[in-house]
Amino acid sequence: MLSRVLRTTIPLCILLTGLGVYRFAAVGNPTPPLTFPRAHPLVIGPRFNLPTVVTDEQLFHVLERLKPPRNPVNTNRLLHALRLWGPHAKFDDSEMMSGPAMQRYFLDAAEFGRLAGVNTPPLYEIDTENGNVLVRDWSPGSPHRTTSSYHLNDILATLAETGTPLDTPLVTVDGTTDIKNLALTAMRRLHLEQHEYEWSVISYARYVYPESGWKNQYGERVLVDELVRELIFAPPHYGACNGLHRLEAMVVLCAADDQVTPAQRTLAVRSRQKMRDYMGEVIRLLGAAQSDQGYWTRQWPRGKSAREDKSASLADKILVTGHQLEWLALVPRDLEPPRNMVVNAGQWLVRAVQEVDNETLLQNYGPFTHAGRALCLWRSKDPYQAWRDGISMVPDSPLQSGQSQSLPDTPRD
């Protein structure tokens, strides 16, 4: 009888004790709320100045072709233009949006409505239940897709890249909030099953790192090492723009990790090493996949056999080569790619951007700006300042170029 009682009560006691320990641990070690370690995003700057990749004059001519496009208004194109030219750019053309005007488009609902049209749905809405700032995402069936955000958190990532402080006012149709609330919403909604997480990681690295371990709105803990696992898990080509924004997210996260003290770091050494190994393997593949002319195609993950790809369009070659050169400019020092690989790619981009026809350039403005930014990074030059310097260097250059054209509304990165 006693043994029967013991068999019944002992497991119950063990269970109750375990639950008590768990509850004590949960109460004694609550999940920390998300906090922002700084008011301004991290500045992740270049360190190269290689005229062999692109000369000053060549850079001017490339940037001259990549000035902000005129009407019709397209959120994706304006976001890429802001990312390339920055919030302080001003052009000698009243029909061309300046940097401040482009920034206002993303920060002020009235300015957005004036440019996008009074019947256009707002870009942001504030959830009355939790205060989250909701961004209108791209939907293939929407008649307003050209004025939507094309990639999850791409606006936040661009605001971070262009140095927008967290206390910057964000004026919506539902009232005024700030960029901190936009970032807080993005981090609350961040989870490991997101279809696109690259811009979320870039935003996290610039605004939030080294914070780690907060709970998202689904009750899941968000850990930086799990974000790294997502970045390196998928095949190389997976994701927007041939998987190349995943590589951008990796170099930005590594650079953010370099800017904090060892005691502050939350990125595990093994996670950083996994990213380094991944990037090192990609650089090896790029060395094998680069064409004799200097470009890459979407087949680059195949290595040497990618050189056999004869079907790639000029637009795709510029997209891939520009994105590759862009993230390569920010890799950790001991992962720097072979110099001749970078020079050949840079010189090919210079020729390609100058020779591409106007219609192709306008239709692919978004990805082509990555080529311009990449070339600027390899010269450690601010794009707007490089263009201004080029005007005096090439006095007979046109100060206005291109004409307003009706563009397709297919989303392009």
Q: What is the predicted function of each stretch?
A:
Residues 4-413:
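Preference for long, amphipathic alpha-helical scaffolds in soluble/luminal domains
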